[in-house]
Amino acid sequence: MKALLALPLLLLLSTPPCAPQVSGIRGDALERFCLQQPLDCDDIYAQGYQSDGVYLIYPSGPSVPVPVFCDMTTEGGKWTVFQKRFNGSVSFFRGWNDYKLGFGRADGEYWLGLQNMHLLTLKQKYELRVDLEDFENNTAYAKYADFSISPNAVSAEEDGYTLFVAGFEDGGAGDSLSYHSGQKFSTFDRDQDLFVQNCAALSSGAFWFRSCHFANLNGFYLGGSHLSYANGINWAQWKGFYYSLKRTEMKIRRA
């Protein structure tokens, strides 16, 4: 089955989800999605769409379709990708509002948005997989059996979109994320880390920084080895603080 064609994020968010036709999306396919309104890529897979690609999901309800990339092949598929980087075409050194709402395009580099991630993990239990690739074409991954964003908060934003991960499984990458569990998300304009300085500014990114990081997957796209300290796309337990990765994907699937 073919995936829905990608559209710019703002266009999709401003388009009525059950319009008879949207440019780039066949009317019958859109109608089918309007009727069933998938929450995530698990739902899309169950509906018979089992090819990698961009689809619409509805984490906040029927009136707001959100484009997302679904990985339908890795380890059985059904993965909802919330972070994807592979060529440095999109700047990830952004402020709080961008990280809250999401940015980029689902058919390219993008961030799904903290609010969408919170709503997903509020409604279902998820596992997390982090896929990594270096510039020598070596690959590795890390998995976590439990993943959620501020699951018990009255207001997820006031709670800082706190990260919770547990149940690490090594796919060669090592565990660089457990250090960040229990920490609020930080950007250069909203410093919520535990360090005396602003970790997001120091690390040229945005993440669930503590003091500061072992993972910096939203850092600068520096193209491999770099002289600057810990401000690239770093996963310290695999490549250290002086190597910026070529490709990263952070994705969740129902546990």
From Swiss-Prot:
Q: What residues does the Fibrinogen C-terminal domain cover?
A: 32-255
Q: Where in the cell is it found?
A: Secreted, Extracellular space, Extracellular matrix
InterPro entries noted in UniProt: Fibrinogen-like_C (IPR036056), Fibrinogen_a/b/g_C_1 (IPR014716), Fibrinogen_a/b/g_C_dom (IPR002181), Fibrinogen_C-term_domain (IPR050373)
Q: Which GO terms describe its biological process?
A: cell adhesion; cellular response to UV-B; elastic fiber assembly; regulation of collagen metabolic process; supramolecular fiber organization; UV protection
> Which UniProt keywords are given for this protein, alphabetically ordered?
Calcium, Cell adhesion, Extracellular matrix, Glycoprotein, Secreted, Signal
**Recorded superkingdom:** Eukaryota
Stretch forming the signal peptide? 1-21
Entry-linked SMART domains: FBG
Q: Which CDD domains match?
A: FReD
Query: At which residues is glycosylation annotated?
Result: 87, 137
Result for mutant: residue 241 to W: Significant reduction in its interaction with COL1A1 and ELN
Location of the motif Cell attachment site: 26-28
A GO cellular component term found in this entry reads: elastic fiber
Q: What does this protein's UniProt record list under function?
A: Could be involved in calcium-dependent cell adhesion or intercellular interactions. May contribute to the elastic fiber assembly and/or maintenance.
Subunit record text: Homodimer. Can also form higher oligomers. Interacts with FBN1, FBN2 and LOX. Interacts with COL1A1 in a Ca (2+)-dependent manner. Interacts with ELN in a Ca (2+)-dependent manner; this interaction promotes ELN self-assembly.
**PANTHER family, A to Z:** FIBRINOGEN/TENASCIN/ANGIOPOEITIN (PTHR19143), MICROFIBRIL-ASSOCIATED GLYCOPROTEIN 4 (PTHR19143:SF225)
What protein name applies here?
Microfibril-associated glycoprotein 4
